[in-house]
Amino acid sequence: MSSPAPDALLGPADIRELAAALGVRPTKQRGQNFVIDANTVRRIVRTAGVRPDDVVVEVGPGLGSLTLALLEAADRVIAVEIDDVLAGALPATIAARMPERAERFALVHSDAMHVRELPGPPPTALVANLPYNVAVPVLLHMLDTFPSIERTLVMVQAEVADRLAADPGSRVYGVPSVKANWHAEVKRAGSIGRNVFWPAPNVDSGLVSLVRRTEPIKTTASKTEVFAVVDAAFAQRRKTLRAALAGWAGSAAAAEAALVAAGVSPQARGESLTVEEFARIAENRGADHADDANN
């Protein structure tokens, strides 16, 4: 595999020139902020641990800054882009700046939330600068839809990064934390300043690393059943679980029965529970009826 030219990556002038030629202005509606620093995208690829045999899927490639850096390191890159103009221009950018890798690139012109299959071999890694406004749903959808993804590194708003990587008991621990942890071991992997983006966002960004669990959570409950408990628990996060889960269980008494059967205090709150504990609660829905039947 030959090495790309040293100037193959996009710099600030390249980004603005490309955008001007395409008539592109980053939009808040789609949470677009383009990375304009080559050192930053190489750092992302390095932090992601991209290997020469990896098939990497990237969501929201934009003008191609990170895409080109991924192509330097991976076997194949599949980019998912919703924007008509950006999707139309990206293959030409790859061909012009990294022609020796162009055949290793594939584009999927679609909303990532609607993607159910990808061309070529199954992806082994997800690396993306995710649009701020859809970061968590897109991340969870990709992890759920493509179990072959072993490693993930996403750049998201710093606040979102903190939530994704939060541990039980943290004030920012919530639905994203639990659902991400269902799929993977999650941790913060660094911070990114505002000055490497165009336009510069009003907030800092963070890198989040997710390594797929080698063994799924041991539970007889389905993901849908477990996530229903999680959603109910955090919909009223200041309430005790006995109260917060009353609607889910059918009554406060039924919620208490499920909690006790799961070994969880009815007076606890969702922010103190691990994903395994949520799974046990889901398993024990209807525990009060089971007790009645046994009496």
Swiss-Prot record:
EC number: 2.1.1.182
Domain of life: Bacteria
Pfam families according to UniProt: RrnaAD
Molecular-function annotations in GO: 16S rRNA (adenine(1518)-N(6)/adenine(1519)-N(6))-dimethyltransferase activity; RNA binding
UniProt-annotated location(s): Cytoplasm
Sites where the protein binds S-adenosyl-L-methionine: N33, V35, G60, E81, D111, N129
CDD domains: AdoMet_MTases (cd02440)
Protein keywords: Cytoplasm, Methyltransferase, RNA-binding, rRNA processing, S-adenosyl-L-methionine, Transferase
One Gene Ontology term, aspect cellular component: cytosol
rRNA processing found in the keyword field: yes
Catalytic activity: adenosine(1518)/adenosine(1519) in 16S rRNA + 4 S-adenosyl-L-methionine = N(6)-dimethyladenosine(1518)/N(6)-dimethyladenosine(1519) in 16S rRNA + 4 S-adenosyl-L-homocysteine + 4 H(+)
InterPro entries per UniProt: KsgA/Erm (IPR001737), rRNA_Ade_diMease-like_C (IPR023165), rRNA_Ade_Mease_Trfase_CS (IPR020596), rRNA_Ade_methylase_Trfase_N (IPR020598), rRNA_adenine_dimethylase (IPR011530), SAM-dependent_MTases_sf (IPR029063)
Reported function: Specifically dimethylates two adjacent adenosines (A1518 and A1519) in the loop of a conserved hairpin near the 3'-end of 16S rRNA in the 30S particle. May play a critical role in biogenesis of 30S subunits.
Family membership noted in the UniProt record: Belongs to the class I-like SAM-binding methyltransferase superfamily. rRNA adenine N(6)-methyltransferase family. RsmA subfamily.
Protein name: Ribosomal RNA small subunit methyltransferase A
Gene this chain is encoded by: rsmA
